[in-house]
Amino acid sequence: MNIQEAKETIEKALRAYFARDEIGFPLVPLRQQRPILLIGPPGIGKTAIMEQIAEECGVGLVAYTMTHHTRQSAMGLPEICTRGIEGKMVHTTEYTMSEIIASIYDCMEQTGKKRGILFLDEINCVSETLAPVMLQLLQDKKFGNQHIPDDWLIVAAGNPPEYNKSVREFDVATLDRVRKIEVLPELSVWLSYAEKNQIHSAVTTYLMAHSDHFYSVSHEADEKRFVTARGWEDLSAVLKSYEILHFPVDEALIGQYLQEEKTAEEFSSYYRIYAVSYTHLRAHETTLHLV
């Protein structure tokens, strides 16, 4: 499905999981509230839709990129405790609260929102020591012996293996406990987003004429070449700022965002023509206004 369909699917899951019957019990029992696993190429807007959903549904959002974390930050730090077992005092290992779970409680306290989304990006690219912790989260909704609070939807995201050599495949036991959604880039959906978010018209008109340049990822030898939706959006922002500041826009700048040589070259040529036409149009409008 495309990113808009994925957003709508997650919104429905959120509302279904949080809904209660007339007695106050969840319509979907807690143990059957499966985490959602988004699998899709990088830069198509997975993180962006989570922010939109949280804002539109009025819930909290705690987001983490899991490749930046260790087993200790996810599970908490071990500490030695003393407890009585069968009349004897023994030392046991317990864990401090997970940094991630603590962040959920911080979010609830700071925003006053008791319901929310825990979004964990790059979940299938974590280190070998952290991988079992992530599997436990998806299977049991907990880190170590600490459960994710009720009324918090777990959404995890990752890239398919063809986009990232670090990807770890999930086993059937894990996939059987999640709602897996495969997301693909779709230009028409992105153009609707672009219109609402005032993406530079040079970008949108170019992509309308060159739809095959919207998204691509390839590997040649040790070189990665790619163009993503994120790249186009960020390029749009820098084009606007350069125009205001009267800075020149060249192929080198464009290539920093569109990291595929042919696309960068062709858009650079298109933008030069666009810039000249736009300048002439503005000059003509100014002349008419003065008359």
Kindly give the residue locations of the regions a language model identified.
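Alpha-helix boundary/capping residues
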Residues: 13, 17, 78-81, 197-198, ...
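Non-catalytic, well-ordered alpha-helical scaffold segments
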Residues: 132, 229-233, 261, 265
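Single, functionally critical "micro-switch" positions that shape active/binding sites
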Residues: 158, 227, 283
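Conserved AAA+ ATPase small/helical "lid" subdomain
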Residues: 198-254
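Charge-dense polyanion-binding interfaces
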Residues: 247-278
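Cytosolic catalytic cores of cyclic-nucleotide second-messenger enzymes
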Residues: 290
